[in-house]
């Protein structure tokens, strides 16, 4: 018995045409994008070591997200040509799981976060491990919106340097390292309830 065509008169259809109709009516099992009526995630992450490339990526992502998906409140909601009374910026989620890395890169991201927090919240999440340069970034989240996983480990140590060259270069680098250390402590004091004396005591443990 042949099955390549239907047998009813006037309603003959090839099987490949039937399959085509079935394909058109089928529903995809995997959604590659959020439904249009759901908010898009405003998410960035720092995973692994913080180097120059990741610093650039995170800073650019912060400013790009800041310029997207905000809501303008008009003085007269019924008049679309009226002046903007207020702009509401939606929060940014920052997931952190890092061994640490470059201190200067840390400060670049930190300064970007501080600039954006003048108008939007940045919610930080510590996951797995937050060490070295990652500690300040976790602490730099909007106060009251800094979160940490139950099994996340935190590690803080003094600024480290790897220097070589003529003695005057080494002296200059040492002064720069001391300055970075002082900046790091001052930033942590500003973002936490820890005092400078307590932080210096922690850093003197030579982790």
Positions of PLM-derived features:
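Terminal-region recognition feature
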Residues: 5-207
